[in-house]
Amino acid sequence: MELNKTLSLLGACLMAFSACNTSHNSSDDNFNDTVASALAGGGNIALDQMQWTREPMAYSISGDSLSITTAAHTDLWQRTYYHFRNDNAPVFQMQTDEQYFSFVVKTDFSQSHRRFDQCGVVMYLDSDNWLKASVEYENEEFQHLGSVVTNNGYSDWATTAIPADVKTMWYRFSRRADDYCIECSRDGSNFSQMRICHIPAAAGRISFGVYACSPEESSFTALFTDFSISECMWKAHDGQQPDEE
């Protein structure tokens, strides 16, 4: 009797494992590598291939244009200095296994008006591992052009002040394996480095795209256009040689 019970339980476990494994394989079979598709198609990104990690209060997609209307008290930040853990900003992303590529997008934040209103590029893996780059409104005199990298649940923030009358910004997000570079541009042609970083959790399949949020009592509409993918524009280092192991 006991042997029969044991065999029955073992059979049930094997069936459950098989079902889970089938489901996992099915998910992999349905995976659409947006970067690979874009590279094969001349660099154009079909926005209908991107997905919401979290939806905003309102949004609109028209051709290659996306608008996001933020809700108040939405943000991305983990622990450092402020001690709070904010993890509710709307994020619109694509997935890829590609190890070398660049992603470019133009942002328009002419409607931002309250402190920390922001929009930009993002690579959001989970609550504790992500990066973002954006312009954050401060006041009528200046804004913060900056980037945040979050590893293992702790965020940092690197910024520089820019005039408040800047209302558009291009970003270029580049990947070389698990190293990343973020650049910005006022004209979409001449890019300046903002950040080089390493994210251990981002060595395999990643999700990346755009985001917008309003951490304080505010709401605004951000516009994203000119989405494109290309071969990696962040070239391999050709200066000082690595130290010998």
Segments predicted by a language model, with ranges:
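Hydrophobic helical h-region of N-terminal Sec-dependent signal peptides
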Residues: 11-15
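C-terminal motif of bacterial Sec signal peptides marking the signal peptidase cleavage site
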Residues: 17-19
